[in-house]
């Protein structure tokens, strides 16, 4: 296992330039600037409720739209997560959380399996929150799951307010990840798989 459980990455393309630092065993601190206000709000919540320390500076082609920026942040965040988690020895591997925010209730289930997958069952009642297209939340979580090599199921069980649904979803993922990356004191540092590898 990577004892520091930390990663710092830089990724530059013709569309985005992203620098991200992630510490899994953090204190929920964040310094986030993606250029998209509501997205920053969600990433801050993700760090806080996951217990991660997150630094992010992203510059993207927002004059076009937010798609490239949001998706590429998901890619880099996933890559950093995968690097920080190391060989996965001694982790719980699975995580589950139900998180309410007023009328909204989202459920997240995570398996740090090495088998990337996103099951997305979230419907938003409007197309935008602030300047952010709500369809981009799925793009973010898909990019994250694929790059982190995890299986992630996110389901909205109830909700009528788009802001509440998004925030409930991000917090649910954060809490599920917090459980999944935590140390299992009974595992004696073993890889949590009958195959011996994840």
Swiss-Prot record:
Q: In which pathway does it act?
A: Amino-acid biosynthesis; L-histidine biosynthesis; L-histidine from 5-phospho-alpha-D-ribose 1-diphosphate: step 6/9
Q: Which Enzyme Commission number(s) are on file for it?
A: 4.2.1.19
UniProt lists the family membership as follows: Belongs to the imidazoleglycerol-phosphate dehydratase family.
What's the protein here called?
A: Imidazoleglycerol-phosphate dehydratase
Gene that this sequence comes from? hisB
What organism does the record attribute this protein to? Gluconobacter oxydans (strain 621H) (Gluconobacter suboxydans)
GO cellular component, alphabetical, reads:
cytoplasm
Among the GO biological process terms of this entry, one is: L-histidine biosynthetic process
**Top EC class, one word:** lyase
Cellular location(s)? Cytoplasm
Q: Which InterPro entries match?
A: IGPD_sf, ImidazoleglycerolP_deHydtase, ImidazoleglycerP_deHydtase_CS, Ribosomal_Su5_D2-typ_SF
Q: Which residues form the signal peptide?
A: none
Single GO molecular function: imidazoleglycerol-phosphate dehydratase activity
* UniProt keyword annotations, A-Z: Amino-acid biosynthesis, Cytoplasm, Histidine biosynthesis, Lyase
List the catalysed reactions.
D-erythro-1-(imidazol-4-yl)glycerol 3-phosphate = 3-(imidazol-4-yl)-2-oxopropyl phosphate + H2O
In which domain of life is the source organism classified?
A: Bacteria
């Amino acid at each position: 296992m990577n004892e520091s459980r930390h990663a710092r990455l830089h990724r530059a393309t013709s569309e985005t330039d992203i620098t991200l630092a992630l510490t899994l065993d953090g204190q929920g601190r964040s310094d986030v600037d993606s250029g998209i206000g509501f997205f920053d709000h969600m990433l801050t919540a993700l760090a806080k409720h996951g217990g991660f320390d997150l630094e992010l500076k992203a510059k993207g082609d927002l004059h076009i739209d937010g798609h490239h920026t949001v998706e590429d942040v998901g890619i880099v965040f996933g890559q950093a997560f995968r690097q920080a988690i190391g060989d996965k020895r001694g982790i719980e591997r699975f995580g589950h959380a139900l998180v309410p925010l007023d009328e909204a209730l989202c459920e997240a289930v995570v398996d740090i399996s090495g088998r990337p997958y996103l099951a997305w069952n979230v419907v938003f009642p409007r197309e935008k929150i602030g300047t952010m297209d709500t369809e981009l939340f799925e793009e973010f979580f898909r990019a994250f799951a694929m790059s982190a090599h995890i299986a992630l199921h996110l389901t909205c069980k109830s909700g009528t307010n788009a802001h509440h649904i998004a925030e409930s979803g991000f917090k649910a993922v954060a809490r599920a990840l917090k459980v999944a990356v935590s140390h299992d004191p009974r595992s004696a540092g073993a890889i949590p798989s009958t195959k011996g590898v994840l």
